[in-house]
A protein has these predicted regions:
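Terminal or standalone catalytic/regulatory effector modules within metabolic enzymes
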Residues: 1-183
Length: 183
């Protein structure tokens, strides 16, 4: 009969935490870390309730991009540069220099840390953006080739103990991480 079979996963307000993550993996190759499933699952459930019906794969992908990738929030990365500092004793530090916008106002920031993420956190602290502890990150390619795009999932812990997540996509995985932090 030569018919193609495409499995269907139905996502509605009663779906479990991992259903939306499975859809993202199958539709666009995003492998959300398990720790992120509940947060995104709640976002999908709220959207399904508001819509009053099941969500399509496209709607779920669009929702993920809106909530994590294309988010227009309080902060935005404008430009940056990393410099590696190699000490005589073998210690390596990373220096972040760049600018971000805070509520539309551009601010120059700089920080030094043990790597790109730490130096970015130090730079953010320099302009009073504190109260977040870096917990974890996961990254993987979403395309192939030496110019592949990578996605980075960031887990932060707020001072009140709440865990929150961000995600960023870029060909430079360091930039993907910064986007995931600042979103």
């Amino acid at each position: 009969l030569h018919r193609e079979y495409e499995p269907v996963i139905r996502i509605n307000s009663q779906s479990g935490k991992g259903g939306a993550a499975v859809v993202l993996q199958q539709a666009v190759g995003y492998n959300l870390p398990k720790e992120m499933h509940p947060e995104f699952g709640n976002i999908v459930k709220a959207a399904a309730d508001a819509y009053g019906d099941e969500l399509s794969s496209k709607q779920i992908v669009d929702l993920f991009k809106k909530e994590y990738i294309d988010l227009q929030g309080k902060y935005a990365l404008v430009r940056h540069r990393f410099t590696e500092l190699n000490e005589a004793d073998g210690t390596i530090h990373s220096r972040f220099e760049g600018s971000i916008t805070i509520d539309g106002v551009e601010k120059y920031i700089t920080g030094v840390g043990n790597g790109p993420i730490d130096s970015f956190f130090q730079a953010l602290a320099g302009v009073g953006i504190t109260g977040y502890k870096f917990v974890n990150y996961h990254e993987h390619a979403v395309s192939s080739g030496s110019d592949a795009q990578g996605i980075c999932y960031i887990e932060l812990k707020k001072e009140n103990g709440e865990h929150i997540f961000g995600a960023g996509i870029h060909a430079n995985i360091n930039v993907a991480a910064l986007k995931g932090i600042i979103c």
